[in-house]
Structure formats: structure tokens, C-alpha cells
């Protein structure tokens, strides 16, 4: 039988291809304890998984490590999901981890989802039950560990935003045995303090076990039944607990919870100054507008006052009088001109003017002008009119030409 000789690279590649083709090794779920943990600056995580008899090298690349819900540590028991393959360059096989959970955490997640679904069906998460967060709280109740970073963050935020706000701190256990009971007692106690306006329920980040006190059913009902609004600031932004769904407002961190509960004094002062400025401008504009209206109405009233009406009528009468005089004068001038023209025309046609040339006029005794000799046949006497007088004559005879 002829045995084919392989190079090292060919052998490693053959083993890799064989492992990659195996269904079980491509979907491996391996339980063990973390050791030799190294988190590279690139974001990749290198470690080993071991049990009592063996160990295997593991790598978790950055894209998968980003989605981890906990920070891995040496000595931590975990279940790693991934595929087994060969690193050809070294000829070593290792587990390429795509997801990883803490051993025993699965039961907690199941319990969390079960309680979450139960309370959701009961309506504890409905927005209609959410109480309004007061804008200007004077006293803020805080339920948290007296020694934790959460309290320091809340105090720092409060000092920065508004030193006049009073914090009433109820020291509570935030993890471990009986921690839920102290949180419940804190809610009951602060609800009895009349001048507490709002309650912050807070703690810093941690694993699901460390935050488990905030997944307590009795605590959820206590938050729901609180007469005072409650803001939760539990863990980090990616951490969600049952009380976050029940509370009146969920903040991603304790600091963010304080930002919501404590109004910023400087911002408020600036808003008040802006309102004052806007009100002043509005009032000035209104006064200016009303003053213009007033002046307009004043002018209308003055224009329609009896005195002004009489004065205006006198002015109108004077204007009409002046106009009438102008028209009369114009009419008289026209008549004078017409009379002068007619006088000149009449003078030009005055028969007496003809008498000045030596001619005479003959009238009968009735002063009727006689222009034909036939009219003399019936007359005995006639009047002769000269340029400077008249004479009465008797007709002795009539001679025809």
C-alpha cells in the first residue's frame, strides 16, 4: 500500500478541513472555567477553558465580544458556544467562541423573562399607570447603597445642577440576601415623608446576579403601588431589570436619574429671564399698538367733534362764499363784456348816427317810421327827426319820381 507524503501545511489544512466539515464541532457548546484570560487592545479576547482533566485554547473576536452581557474573569465558570478549528500556522486547534454565558445564568434569565411576562399581562408596565415626573422637585428621596458609586454620582449631579435641592437618602442593600426587602422598606418609608416629591431607586452596574435584587416580584409591586413617582437608575445603559419596566421613568444610569429628578437651576433662571424679556417685549409691542389705536381714535374723535364740525362748516361756507363771489364776479364781468359788445354793436347800427350825416327820419303821429311815400297819402301831418331834434310838418302835396 502506497502512503502519500504530505507537507506540514497540507496536513494542517487537511485536519482543518476535516474539523470544519464536522457538524458537532461546528456547533460546539463547551462548559469550563476561564483561565489565562487576555483582552487585547484590538478588542479580541484570548483565554483557555479548563476542567479537572483538560483544557482548550479559545479566541473570541471583537465583533462577538462586543455583545457580551458580562465581563469575563479568570476562574469564572462559563458555557462557550462556537466552532472548533485549526490555526494552520501553528498547527494547533482551538475553540472560536461566538457567544458565552455564565454557568447557571440561564436559569436566572428564564426566571426574569417569566416574571416580566407575568407582570406585563397584569398591566404593571402600561403607560396609563405611569405617574408624572414633577418638573421642580424640592426634596428628592434616594434609595441606594450609602457606600456605592451610585450615591456619589447622584450627589455630584445634584450639586452641579441645583445646590438648593435636598436629598433624603435611605441606605439600602442593593445586592445579596434581603436586599429586596430593604429596597421595599425604603419605598414605604419615603412614601410616608410628605415633602418628598420624587424617589430615585439606584445602584451601579454589575452582573445579572448582582442586579437580581431589582428583579424581585414584591419589589415590582411596591414600585407600582408607590404614591410618589419613582425613577430607576440601575446599572448601565444596556442593563434592564424588572423595576425598570414598572417605574414611572427608567434612566440608563444613576447619574441620568439625577439629571431627570433635579432641575437645573441655571437653565431655569435663563428660561425665566427669557420669559421676562419676551413678556417685556410683548407688552411694549401691545402698548405701542394700543397707543397707535388710541391716537387714531383720538384723531377720529377730534375730526368728528362739534367744534371741529362747526369750524369745518365755517371753512366750507367761506370756501363756498369765495367760490360764489368768484362766480358772481365772473358772471358780472361776462355780462359787462357782453353788454359792452352789444352796446358797441347797437351803437354801430343806431339810425341816429345816420342823421349826423344830414339824413332825417319821418314818422307818423303815432311815432311809426315811414319808409314809403304811399304811407303819406293817408296822413296830414308827419314828424321829421333830425340828429338834434324833431319837427312836425303838414303835408301839402306828394310828388312821385
UniProtKB/Swiss-Prot annotation:
InterPro entries: Exonuc_VII_L (IPR003753), Exonuc_VII_lsu_C (IPR020579), OB-fold_nuc-bd_dom (IPR025824). GO terms for molecular function: exodeoxyribonuclease VII activity; nucleic acid binding. Its EC number is 3.1.11.6. One of its GO terms (biological process) is DNA catabolic process. One of its GO terms (cellular component) is exodeoxyribonuclease VII complex. Its main location: cytoplasm. Coiled coil: none annotated. Disulfide bonds: none annotated. Keywords: Cytoplasm, Exonuclease, Hydrolase, Nuclease. It is found in: Cytoplasm. It catalyses: Exonucleolytic cleavage in either 5'- to 3'- or 3'- to 5'-direction to yield nucleoside 5'-phosphates. Heterooligomer composed of large and small subunits. Belongs to the XseA family. Bidirectionally degrades single-stranded DNA into large acid-insoluble oligonucleotides, which are then degraded further into small acid-soluble oligonucleotides. This is Exodeoxyribonuclease 7 large subunit. It comes from Clostridium botulinum (strain 657 / Type Ba4). The gene is xseA.
Amino acid at each position: 500500500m502506497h502512503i502519500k507524503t504530505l507537507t506540514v501545511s497540507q496536513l494542517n489544512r487537511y485536519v482543518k478541513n476535516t474539523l470544519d466539515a464536522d457538524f458537532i464541532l461546528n456547533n460546539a457548546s463547551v462548559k469550563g472555567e476561564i483561565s489565562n484570560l487576555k483582552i487585547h487592545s484590538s478588542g479580541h479576547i484570548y483565554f483557555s477553558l479548563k476542567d479537572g482533566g483538560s483544557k482548550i485554547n479559545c479566541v473570541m473576536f471583537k465583533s462577538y465580544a462586543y455583545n457580551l452581557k458580562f465581563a469575563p474573569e479568570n476562574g469564572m465558570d462559563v458555557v462557550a458556544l462556537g466552532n472548533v478549528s485549526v490555526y494552520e500556522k501553528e498547527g494547533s486547534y482551538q475553540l472560536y467562541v461566538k457567544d458565552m454565558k455564565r454557568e447557571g445564568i440561564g436559569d436566572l434569565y428564564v426566571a426574569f423573562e417569566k416574571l416580566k411576562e407575568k407582570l406585563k399581562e397584569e398591566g404593571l408596565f402600561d403607560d396609563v399607570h405611569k405617574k408624572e415626573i414633577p418638573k421642580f422637585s424640592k426634596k428628592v428621596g434616594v434609595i441606594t447603597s450609602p457606600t456605592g458609586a451610585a450615591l456619589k454620582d447622584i450627589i455630584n449631579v445634584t450639586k452641579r445642577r441645583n445646590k438648593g435641592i435636598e436629598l433624603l437618602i435611605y441606605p439600602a442593600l442593593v445586592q445579596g440576601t434581603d436586599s429586596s426587602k430593604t429596597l421595599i422598606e425604603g419605598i414605604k418609608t419615603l412614601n410616608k415623608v410628605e415633602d418628598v416629591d420624587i424617589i430615585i431607586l439606584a445602584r451601579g452596574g454589575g452582573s445579572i446576579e448582582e442586579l437580581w435584587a431589582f428583579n424581585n416580584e414584591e419589589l415590582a409591586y411596591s414600585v407600582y403601588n408607590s404614591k410618589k413617582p419613582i425613577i430607576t437608575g440601575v446599572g448601565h445603559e444596556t442593563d434592564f431589570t424588572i423595576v425598570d419596566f414598572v417605574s414611572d421613568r427608567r434612566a440608563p444610569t444613576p447619574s441620568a436619574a439625577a439629571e431627570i429628578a433635579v432641575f437645573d437651576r441655571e437653565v431655569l433662571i435663563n428660561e425665566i429671564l427669557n420669559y421676562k424679556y419676551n413678556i417685556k417685549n410683548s407688552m411694549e409691542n401691545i402698548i405701542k399698538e394700543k397707543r397707535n389705536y388710541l391716537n387714531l381714535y383720538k384723531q377720529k374723535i377730534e375730526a368728528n367733534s362739534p367744534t371741529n364740525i362747526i369750524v369745518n362748516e365755517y371753512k366750507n361756507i367761506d370756501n363756498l362764499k369765495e367760490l360764489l363771489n368768484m362766480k358772481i364776479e365772473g358772471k358780472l364781468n361776462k355780462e359787462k363784456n357782453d353788454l359792452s359788445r352789444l352796446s358797441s354793436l347797437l351803437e354801430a347800427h343806431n339810425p341816429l348816427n345816420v342823421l349826423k350825416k344830414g339824413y332825417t327820419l319821418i314818422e307818423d303821429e303815432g311815432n311809426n317810421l315811414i319808409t314809403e311815400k304811399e304811407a303819406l297819402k293817408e296822413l296830414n301831418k308827419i314828424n321829421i327827426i333830425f340828429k338834434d331834434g324833431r319837427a312836425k310838418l303838414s303835408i301839402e302835396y306828394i310828388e312821385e319820381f
